[in-house]
Amino acid sequence: MTQVAKKILVTCALPYANGSIHLGHMLEHIQADVWVRYQRMRGHEVNFICADDAHGTPIMLKAQQLGITPEQMIGEMSQEHQTDFAGFNISYDNYHSTHSDENRELSELIYTRLKENGFIKNRTISQLYDPEKGMFLPDRFVKGTCPKCKSADQYGDNCEVCGATYSPTELIEPKSVVSGATPVMRDSEHFFFDLPSFSEMLQAWTRSGALQEQVANKMQEWFESGLQQWDISRDAPYFGFEIPNAPGKYFYVWLDAPIGYMGSFKNLCDKRGDTTSFDEYWKKDSDAELYHFIGKDIVYFHSLFWPAMLEGSHFRKPTNLFVHGYVTVNGAKMSKSRGTFIKASTWLKHFDADSLRYYYTAKLSSRIDDIDLNLEDFVQRVNADIVNKVVNLASRNAGFINKRFDGVLAAELADPQLYKTFTDAAAVIGEAWESREFGKAIREIMALADIANRYVDEQAPWVVAKQEGRDADLQAICSMGINLFRVLMTYLKPVLPTLSERVEAFLNSELNWDAIEQPLLGHKVNTFKALYNRIDMKQVEALVESSKEEVKAAAAPVTGPLADFPIQETITFDDFAKIDLRVALIENAEFVDGSDKLLRLTLDLGGEKRNVFSGIRSAYPDPQALIGRQTVMVANLAPRKMRFGVSEGMVMAAGPGGKDIFLLSPDDGAKPGQQVK
């Protein structure tokens, strides 16, 4: 049964680093993990990697909203994402970030090669600009009506209804997502990837037969409508990698995001001290296999742009794309108000990971069909299949083996032909796992479980146990049941890793695909302990209620200094150097007639006197208390004429205003007139 070992690199689409993992994400990661675990069981060398997609304006703006830096936000998100995936036993060899040195180097390398090969074009474009926020609007921050299918409320780069891609300027009735303002047009020089140059190569790849039929058909539609050059640059302000030799221009997030697959693998190789595998897997003539598990909403990027970028920069193309559909809950789109928009972490507070892994697996196929998580059906199916059919098979037999035979199984099989029926099914079940026909694999396994339970029903060990002189029969029957259980759990091991660990502990034997040909005979098992508990609708109700409460909590406004007053746009060192900050001694402080906000300060700069009006009266109702205190002032601010006189600078203070204003003071020892650097 052993196959020739293959070298396989598997990826999942990179989760965006501005939000939590939810059950929609988990479909893909579970699907990929089941496939990867099966490949590993068959002896293949599998590298399973992922990363956070950590760039783009949405992350920059979300960080501002939270009052933290983008780097801090993506760091916290990465930890949260990795915790969630570990909780669902997603067996990644490496989880990285697109905001990494490896990804920067590879993005610059691929861009440079594309440019050297003539595939990067420059031209000035008219771009949507938010006049209220003073920024160019990235694709995802413009919404309007799709120019192709006329669906409303679609983003500026692609339509989630028909899958079309387009320029934000093509949207009908566009609006800024940031401010709600109607964008205006402004010119900007942008860089374009010449996708049409790869049309012939992409069509040949499509016709190769490797892609899912639905994907190939969709690509053919795109070819017929004509491929367009792809805008790969964005203007500052932008959180990402600056394009080499192009100040103020950044790589569009969708350029460096798929390169993140390469970056994560490079990071893994470096961790291992492996200097050869990266080139071995990614060189143009590599014989390693590369598979991307993705959702149907990002097929365009992975089936057109990504292979074309790789081809144009002399790297290998993917072996295949494995595309899945969306997740609905109880027959409808996931809803925050109904409590069906469920985060991965919330699920794990109410159910184990194996339960969702099993339910998704039972519904998955190689097609791009949506999967419905019907919560009532979920409870019934987990109890009927995992508990009643599989685990119950072990519990019905293990007690007799433990109590009557000291845990030792019979030396011979009671029904070798029946056992062969189970092991012969390995070919069909293995092919179903291989071809991602997961639902078929589960149906085959559950059909065998029915046969195994029927065998136990017919042999009735509970009756035999009461009959004198039939100990050997009892041991043989129960040993047969446990061996059939072992085969079933071997087939289910890619799906149920936690349960499999418990089963291996009970059997005192690893669940190994190639070992099922040899049954456990004369083998001592350990004391049987409950392997899996039934679930009920009360847990579902608690899950839904928890999700609703989390939505309410998340809707509470974020407060704090950075949230209330976000950090301003970045300035250069030269800009900062223009500001001349000096230590100043407050010689006098007094109220200003006609103003309930200002104090008049007389400042000594160590040989020069300044008159400054400062709006700090609400925090310092007794101005005399300021006399003799040192502070910091902007000494080279242009004088400002006011109706009370001329203000010759500005003193520095912190706080939101009102009584919460705090005049800055240097440490003891500072002298009036000294420069603050």
Curated annotation (Swiss-Prot):
Xref: Gene3D superfamilies: HUPs, Isoleucyl-tRNA Synthetase, Domain 1, Methionyl-tRNA synthetase, Zn-domain, Nucleic acid-binding proteins
Which keywords does UniProt give here?
Aminoacyl-tRNA synthetase, ATP-binding, Cytoplasm, Ligase, Metal-binding, Nucleotide-binding, Protein biosynthesis, RNA-binding, tRNA-binding, Zinc
Which GO terms label this protein's molecular function in UniProt? ATP binding; metal ion binding; methionine-tRNA ligase activity; tRNA binding
Q: Where does the UniProt annotation locate this protein?
A: Cytoplasm
List the GO terms this entry assigns under cellular component, sorted alphabetically.
Answer: cytosol
State the span of motif ('HIGH' region): 15-25
| UniProt superkingdom | Bacteria
Q: Which residues form a coiled coil?
A: none
Q: Say yes or no: keyword Cytoplasm present.
A: yes
Known EC number(s)?
6.1.1.10
Reactions it catalyzes: tRNA(Met) + L-methionine + ATP = L-methionyl-tRNA(Met) + AMP + diphosphate
Cofactor(s), by name: Zn(2+)
Indicate whether Cytoplasm appears among the record's keywords: yes
Give any single GO term for biological process: methionyl-tRNA aminoacylation
Specify which residues bind ATP according to the UniProt entry for this protein.
Answer: 336
Enzyme class at the top of the EC tree: ligase
> What is the cofactor note?
Binds 1 zinc ion per subunit.
Instruction: Please state the protein's primary subcellular location.
Output: cytoplasm
Spell out the NCBIfam families in the cross-references. metG, metG_C_term, PRK00133.1
Task: Give the family this protein belongs to, as stated in its UniProt record.
Answer: Belongs to the class-I aminoacyl-tRNA synthetase family. MetG type 1 subfamily.
Q: What does this protein do?
A: Is required not only for elongation of protein synthesis but also for the initiation of all mRNA translation through initiator tRNA(fMet) aminoacylation.
From the Swiss-Prot or TrEMBL record, give the protein name.
Methionine--tRNA ligase
Q: Write the lineage as a comma-separated list.
A: Bacteria, Pseudomonadati, Pseudomonadota, Gammaproteobacteria, Enterobacterales
